A protein has these predicted regions:
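Glycine-enriched alpha-helix->loop->beta-strand junction motifs that scaffold or abut catalytic
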Residues: 43, 62-66, 94-98, 124-127, ...
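N-terminal amphipathic alpha-helix/helix-capping segment at the start of soluble metabolic enzymes
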Residues: 1-26
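Conserved, mostly hydrophobic/aromatic
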Residues: 39, 58, 91, 143, ...
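Catalytic domains of carbohydrate-active enzymes, especially glycoside hydrolases
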Residues: 35-48, 94-95
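Conserved beta-strand positions in the central sheet of alpha/beta enzyme cores
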Residues: 15, 46-48, 67, 99-102, ...
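Short beta-strand/loop segments at the ligand-binding rim of alpha/beta enzyme cores
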Residues: 11-16, 62-76, 117, 122-132, ...
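Glycine-rich phosphate-binding active-site loops on the catalytic face of alpha/beta enzymes
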Residues: 18-21, 41, 70-74, 94-108, ...
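Active-site-adjacent beta->alpha loops and helix N-cap segments on the catalytic face
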Residues: 25-29, 48-67, 78-85, 103-121, ...
């Protein structure tokens, strides 16, 4: 059974992204776990983390709900946020509360559409919560329609058809908040 109470726990609060990629100076599961501790001490209500190693280390240090992702690049696709079942399977094993996936209308590796992959994902993990990382209004509506549990504005400005968007795109956040019934997580370009 899905734990929808998680959305009440994070509503109105700050979810802090604790991520550093391999070539970035803070790349280390140890450092990410300490960033998560600092976020929790500062009042964060949740953490967004990348990789099984970081999620596992963060889980040892904080008790905040987590949005988990795995950034994985495939040569035949621009989609890299939890793009395939391989990454979803690995994240489910961590016990992360919410798994975020790129929900843009771009094709995934192997030419799969979002509908193709998410149908497989939802059938395999009916009780797992999934967040749709969207770049535009139409994607958010579609993500809700196919069964995502929440939508985020994560990809606004990062797709060819949204590049140049001034971030944070508050009008986009407001528009989808009024249009969907699932929770909306305002994310991307928010530096306050």
């Amino acid at each position: 059974m899905k734990n929808l109470d998680i959305f009440d726990r994070v509503r109105g609060g700050l979810i802090v992204s604790c991520q550093a990629l391999e070539k970035e100076p803070l790349h280390s599961s140890f450092i990410m776990s300490r960033m998560a501790v600092a976020a929790e001490m500062s009042g964060a209500v949740g953490i967004r983390a990348n990789t099984v190693a970081d999620i596992t280390e963060i889980r040892k240090m904080v008790r905040l709900p987590m949005i988990g992702i795995i950034k994985q690049i495939y040569k035949d696709s621009d989609v890299y946020i939890t793009p395939t079942m391989v990454e979803v399977d690995a994240l489910v094993e961590t016990g992360v509360e919410i798994i975020a996936m790129d929900a843009t209308n771009r094709l995934r590796t192997g030419g799969k559409s979002l509908d193709d992959i998410f149908h497989e994902v939802r059938n395999k993990y009916p009780d797992q919560l999934f967040m749709a990382d969207c770049s535009c209004y139409e994607e958010a509506l579609h993500a809700e329609e196919i069964g995502f549990d929440c939508v985020g504005t994560t990809m606004a400005g990062y797709t060819p058809y949204t590049q140049g968007t001034s971030l944070p795109d508050l009008a986009f956040i407001q528009k989808i908040s009024q249009a969907v019934d699932v929770p909306v997580i305002a994310e991307g370009g928010i530096h306050y």
